[in-house]
Amino acid sequence: MANRINLNATSYHGAGAIAEIANEAKAHGFKKAFVCSDPDLIKFNVTSKVTDILTANGLDYELYSDIKPNPTIENVKHGVEAFKASGADYLIAIGGGSSMDTSKAIGIIIANPEFEDVRSLEGTAPTKNPCVPIIAVPTPAGTAAEVTINYVITDVERKRKFVCVDPHDMPIIAVVDPDMMSSMPKGLTASTGMDALTHAIEGYTTKAAWEMTDMFHLKAIELISKSLRGAVANTKEGREGMALGQYIAGMGFSNVGLGIAHSMAHTLGAVYDTPHGVACAMMLPIVMEYNQECTGEKYREIARAMGVTGVDEMSQEEYRKAAIDAVKKLSADVGIPSVLEAVKEEDLQFLADSAHADACAPGNPKDASVEDLKDLFRKIMA
């Protein structure tokens, strides 16, 4: 069987990388940008770091900010209408997964108008045309949406999130500039960083993992583990390490999928509006404990990548526990809670059914039943 890798046509990394946006826009002959960014980034003058560059280079743009942290079907509909009215010919996504997922959905629907209802794109989307060109500029280090073929939309009416998988939505250019991440709050840095670690660990242990993605994921685990605490403290080294680590994780998991930590996190986000990274961080060690019997020696390498010493002398039980404990400690060190008070016993059936139906669930190394998922959700109850 052939293994596929989809990546950006071009990516820029390092402090000051956003200066390349104007050069790329001119080189591609773009006329007007549709800039997607959430209201907080606009309020705190993060978005303006990019729009000021556009203005200085005589590049026209229109700003769209009707974006929620868990972007909704309505956000996408309004975005499609606004894009059509704008006269823009490319998108610039500035922010985290919310801005990028909204941009991807807009770009796909504009290029494939037969899929006007974004719900029709759930799962492996059958589009024929590449989306409107996207230049993606992440601000938190975590989602890696700038280098993935996935986007996640919330169906508020049905209280669920759905995943769309489509190589046509890949941004043509990713600009990963740690300076864009320096103004992010500590809590957001922590939660998105744990999302990145979840990407790396789930991608490493998923059923579809192979040698190249294993290489990506182990390096990502190493970088994230040694950088996240520093990033939360807003050190230069921490921000730079997280910027690279989360991107490398995206290079991997986008091409092999994830597991039930993500399917459960999607459900928590849809039902309780739990921040995605917080939900991932809560579920990751619980799911690792559940999956451990189906992971061979991979937890030994996870423990090693996370800085645990003496793993070669450990028994299977010891190195698996060491890997899980390292994840728990990192999560606690950056202030992530381990319980979610909103979860009630009467919610468990709906939560488990939704997580079981999520597109990420089949990739889990251990097949999880609805009853298994109920038991796992129970572990985060207060």
Regions found by a protein language model. Give the residues of each.
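N-terminal small/polar loop signature for handling phosphorylated ligands or for N-terminal nucleophile
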Residues: 42-115, 229-239
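Carboxylate- and glycine-rich phosphate/diphosphate-binding segment that chelates Mg2+/Mn2+
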Residues: 150-256
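Short glycine/serine/threonine-rich phosphate/pyrophosphate-binding segments
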Residues: 18-21, 43-46, 73-76, 99-103, ...
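Catalytic phosphate/nucleotide-handling subdomain of diverse soluble enzymes
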Residues: 267-306
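C-terminal charged capping/lid subdomain of soluble metabolic enzymes
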Residues: 299, 303, 309-382
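Glycine/threonine-rich beta-strand-loop-alpha-helix active-site module
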Residues: 74-179
